[in-house]
Design a protein with these regions (language model features):
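Hydrophobic residues in well-ordered beta-strands that form the structural core
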Residues: 53, 92, 117-119, 148, ...
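N-terminal Rossmann-like dinucleotide-binding module
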Residues: 1-46
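Beta-loop-alpha module in the N-terminal Rossmann-like domain of NAD(P)-dependent dehydrogenases
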Residues: 16, 46-109
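Mid-domain beta-loop-alpha active-site segment that forms a flexible
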Residues: 120-128, 151, 155-192, 199-206, ...
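Glycine- and charged-residue-rich phosphate/anionic-cofactor binding loop of Rossmann-like
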Residues: 27-29, 268-274, 290-308
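A contiguous active-site-proximal alpha/beta segment in oxidoreductase catalytic domains
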Residues: 74, 97-157
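Active-site loop of classical SDR/Rossmann-like NAD(P)-dependent oxidoreductases
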Residues: 15, 34-37, 272-285, 301
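Contiguous beta-strand/loop segments that form the cofactor/metal-binding neighborhood of enzyme cores
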Residues: 177-259, 274, 282-295, 314-315, ...
Length: 358
């Protein structure tokens, strides 16, 4: 079995543990967290693992094959460096470091060593996006011309969490920046962003960006955690439209079921399957396959994918500051939203109560 250590036992660390425990290919050897409450929970949920508050024992243990990095972004550069120096394979949350410069340094480090590295750009591992791309590749919609992506939820409120990853267009939006690039199979050429400072918060918490790729495909990406935080019954708006010269592909979901419409020149297919969540099961399967065969799985997201998406999300976010950036609402409403979320037990993107290392 592949021995794995989890560093950071907040929300994502717990997701990884659940998937590792379901797999017959992994053994969780260590869980590390600096927070005593997180370590206590780790003891309870993973009695088979050694729970520690320092990473050095993990790196010195030659039996550990893989480290999974789920602590805050500011710690990832040093943890990636230590892991690769110790000969470990690495699964990291995004972004892979706290600054663009540090991210590209980690890309160069990873690409210059013989260990397998990957990052949880989970949309690339979803059944629905892979099904859509196969349909596009078959020629059924003609040439792909327009990519439209929208993801708005009542998710993290400003100041609530993930501040080390920046405003939500970087923290969450970089997934969609990466997804558009993956569909286009091209690099970004132009971008223009319009933001909104909801509740008069200092940073835009909603952004729409549109532009072109180098191959001529156009895109628009809309992302924000602004979608009805105080609604009695909360909902969200998430979809992808791929528009070709002859047909279209459309996907939407309710976080439980994904609905896909494929409308080509010879075939119409409508499919519904379970959404799949963060798709961590597929990510760790790809890592296990790579380790056991000695050949990197081509579908496994790379550090370079993450760095490009992070850099472009920052550029788009910064572009929004150079246009008119209106502010609507007030900080009192924002504080009411935060208070509501502190007391919610069922909602969008709620953080664990002990959220220091989420």
């Amino acid at each position: 079995m592949i021995n794995v250590a989890i560093i950071g036992f907040g929300r994502m660390g717990r997701f990884y543990l659940a998937e590792f425990q379901k797999s017959d290919r992994y053994r969780v050897s260590y869980i590390c967290d600096v927070d005593a409450d997180c370590r206590q929970l780790a003891h309870k949920q993973a009695p088979e693992a050694k729970v520690v508050d320092d990473t050095e024992e993990i790196y010195k243990d030659a039996s550990v094959d893989v480290v999974t990095l789920c602590a805050l972004a500011g710690s990832r550069k040093e943890q990636i460096r230590r892991a690769l120096e110790a000969g470990k394979h690495v699964i990291a949350e995004k972004p892979i470091a706290d600054t663009i410069e540090n991210e590209w340094e980690m890309v160069r480090l990873a690409e210059g060593c013989d260990r397998f590295t990957t990052v949880n750009m989970y949309l690339l591992n979803s059944w629905y996006h892979n099904e859509i791309r196969r349909f596009i590749d078959s020629g059924e919609i003609g040439e792909l011309a327009i990519i439209r992506i929208c993801h708005m939820t009542p998710g993290l409120a400003p100041g609530e969490g993930h501040e080390t990853e920046g405003p939500c267009f970087h923290d969450c939006g970089m997934h969609y920046v990466n997804l558009a690039r993956w569909y286009a199979r091209s690099e970004y050429r132009t971008w223009h962003a319009q933001g909104m400072r909801m509740w008069s918060y200092k940073d835009p918490w909603w952004i729409q960006c549109h532009g072109t790729f180098q191959n001529g495909i156009v895109y628009d990406i809309t992302q924000g955690f602004v979608y009805g935080q105080m609604s009695k019954d909360q909902t969200h708006n998430s979809y992808v439209d791929l528009i070709g010269t002859k047909g279209i592909c459309h996907m939407t979901h309710n976080f439980k079921t994904a609905h896909v419409e494929l409308r080509g020149v010879n075939e119409t297919r409508i499919e519904e399957r379970p959404f799949g969540g963060k798709n961590i099961d597929r990510l760790i399967t790809e890592m296990a396959d790579s380790i056991e065969t000695g050949q990197r799985r081509k579908d496994m997201p790379t550090f370079r994918d993450s760095a490009v998406a992070s850099e472009m999300a920052w550029k788009m976010l910064q572009d929004s500051y150079h246009t008119e950036l209106p502010a609507i609402g007030d900080l009192q409403t924002l504080e009411a939203i935060r208070e509501r979320r502190r007391n919610m037990t069922d909602g969008y993107g709620l953080l664990p109560r002990n959220n220091k290392n989420v």
